[in-house]
Amino acid sequence: MSQDWSQFKNFSIEEFRCQHSGDDGMDLNFVAKVQKLRTAFGAGLTISSGYRSPEHPIEAKKATGPGSHASGRACDIRIYGQDALDLLHLALDSGDFTGIGVQQAGDRSRRFIHLDDLDNQSRPTIWSY
């Protein structure tokens, strides 16, 4: 089923496709929240991981089964330093995200902030990798 991505000024379907299968399984309501965050941030955001099919190697090896990326309601944004701190504050203040993961150690090219909007019992939550 084809989805209409024309509502997103700063993002395209290609940025969010599964890097393993090429599938598009993003929830457009979630992408709208990321677009709202991007607009508030006022600068480009690089999506390092969006949708992951259940067969994606990262999802397939999870003991509890596929996670938030497989639901189409999560993404990782490659960002570090002051920009990461600014984005983190905006994401927290927005109230749109119930899961926020922060990876800011090591090589800058591998640093990111994870965002999701799952609505299970253990939310809201924030964690570090």
Question: PLM ranges: what are they?
Answer:
Residues 1-40, 108, 114, 118-129:
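Extracytoplasmic cell-surface/polysaccharide-interacting catalytic and binding patches
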Residues 9-12, 55, 60, 64, ...:
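Solvent-exposed, flexible loop/coil residues
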Residues 19-27, 42-44, 62, 79-84:
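Generic structural signal for short, solvent-exposed loop/turn connectors between secondary structure elements
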Residues 24-31, 50, 71, 81:
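Generic alpha-helical scaffold signal
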Residues 25-27, 54-58, 79-80, 91-94:
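A short linear-motif detector with a strong N-terminal bias
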Residues 32-62:
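Extended, low-complexity, intrinsically disordered C-terminal regulatory tails
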Residues 65-66, 70-75, 79-129:
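Catalytic cores and adjacent binding grooves of peptidoglycan-active enzymes
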